[in-house]
A protein has these predicted regions:
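Short, solvent-exposed amphipathic alpha-helices that sit
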Residues: 14-24
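Active-site-adjacent pocket-lining segments in enzyme domains
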Residues: 1-5, 10, 23-33, 51-177
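N-terminal beta-loop-helix "entrance" segment that forms/cooperates
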Residues: 32-52
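Short N-terminal binding/cap micro-motifs at the start of the first secondary-structure element
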Residues: 10-15, 39
Length: 177
């Protein structure tokens, strides 16, 4: 089970590419509204009806944090979001963040001693991190990726982490990527 946390201002490509490809890999995915409404509006005014409200979101194998401004600051300002992400990491469950969202992991000190990547210019927000030169990287229980342009690689990496190389390759081939 993967929970993708959405706040108003999220980056649509990063969130929806992840949801789509993970579902193609037959991974249970919930789009989780962290707002007061089940509908969340992305940074480019695409409105998405989420599957569940944050208060009703079950425990999961991975929390995915899409980027986007003001989506990332909106996620970061929600104590229930940061508490869940911190608990997820501390229990050695997986977290994934793309674009500006690794900033949240930095604020929670999850990036310390971990190889990560983020949107260029946000590196100083990744406290104690080892900044990767890769566009997408998994280290320990953390998967990160650079930007909307790496959303396909990010989603395929999550599939690889959760279901293995063969399933990731099958999904990749099925979309002719």
């Amino acid at each position: 089970m993967v929970n993708i946390f959405l706040a108003n201002g999220f980056e649509e490509v990063e969130a929806l590419t992840s949801a789509d490809l993970l579902r193609r890999a037959e991974i249970d995915v919930l789009l989780v509204s962290t707002e007061k409404d089940i509908y969340v509006t992305g940074n480019h005014n695409i409105c998405v009806k989420c599957d569940v409200m944050l208060a009703d979101a079950p425990d999961c194998d991975m929390i995915v944090l899409p980027g986007g401004i003001p989506g990332v600051p909106n996620l970061m300002s929600n104590k229930e979001v940061t508490d869940r992400v911190k608990k997820q990491s501390e229990s050695e469950q997986r977290v994934a963040a793309i674009c500006a969202a690794p900033w949240i992991l930095g604020e929670l000190k999850i990036t310390e001693g971990t190889e990560v990547i983020c949107y260029p210019g946000f590196e100083d927000k990744l406290k104690g991190a080892v900044i990767s030169t890769k566009s997408t990287v998994t280290d320990k229980n953390v998967t990160t990726s650079k930007a909307a342009g790496t959303a396909m690689d990010f989603a395929l990496e999550i599939i690889k982490v959760l279901k293995g190389d063969d399933v990731a390759l099958k999904v990749k081939n099925s979309i002719y990527y």
